[in-house]
């Protein structure tokens, strides 16, 4: 089905070629595995209901396909806290609406041409960058371009340059917070840090848990995301 997010789950309709939709989620929304997903949220976010609601709105806003908050979402916490599991499960459920970017692309130490990577962002809703090295400094010009409503200038290899209006939200999950210049107000304004304080070990640590979540609760995860979108839209895109 195709979903009109302004109507939430009631906005389901049959696929229509005239919609010109070229991407698809990996699952359809349903309630199967909802208990598994809710238990996972409580575990990862330490039963913090307000934080869970906030993160649901962040993810829900991301999938709308228009930039309403010009921000880099930083999921921060020491290892074994579920942050990679959470974001990888979200990304896999979103299928071709999600993509990845090398974390070093965001840093001043990156010397390669990043325009081919930027070209892959066109039409995506959620972009994940994973794990910065300790002490890395953010490249302010790259952050401002990727976390903005302004056109992104990119090019694929051996192709002519082009520009596009961003539709994505960029998430960086990392054990180490990046460095930012103290006087760089523009970059500070674009940073939203989501804390991950859980310590998941022993019986609570399931290997390849993101795959397990998608296999056993993928539809419930997508439904949770759609509900987040609906809440954000009703509240006027205010976080």
Listing of model-derived features with the role each one plays in the protein:
Residues 1-239:
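Feature primarily recognizes SF3-like P-loop helicase cores of small DNA viruses
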């Amino acid at each position: 089905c195709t979903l009109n997010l302004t109507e939430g789950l009631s906005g389901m309709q049959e696929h229509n070629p005239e919609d010109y939709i070229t991407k698809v989620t990996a699952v359809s929304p349903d309630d199967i595995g909802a208990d598994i997903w809710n238990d996972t949220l409580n575990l990862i976010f330490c039963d913090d209901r307000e934080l869970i609601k906030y993160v649901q709105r962040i993810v829900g806003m991301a999938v709308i396909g228009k930039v309403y908050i010009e921000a880099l979402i930083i999921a921060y916490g020491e290892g074994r806290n579920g942050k990679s599991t959470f974001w990888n499960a979200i990304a896999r459920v979103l299928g071709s609406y999600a993509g990845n970017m090398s974390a070093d692309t965001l840093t001043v130490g990156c010397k390669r041409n990043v325009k081919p990577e930027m070209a892959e962002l066109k039409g995506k809703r959620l972009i994940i960058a994973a794990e910065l090295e300790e002490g890395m400094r953010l490249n302010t010009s790259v952050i401002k371009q990727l976390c903005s409503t302004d056109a992104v200038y990119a090019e694929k290899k051996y192709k002519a340059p082009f520009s596009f209006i961003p539709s994505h939200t960029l998430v960086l999950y990392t054990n180490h917070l990046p460095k930012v210049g103290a006087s760089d107000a523009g970059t500070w304004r674009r940073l939203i840090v989501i804390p991950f304080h859980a310590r998941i070990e022993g019986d609570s640590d399931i290997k390849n848990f993101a795959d397990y979540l998608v296999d056993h609760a993928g539809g419930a995860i997508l439904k949770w995301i759609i509900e987040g979108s609906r809440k954000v839209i009703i509240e006027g895109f205010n976080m």
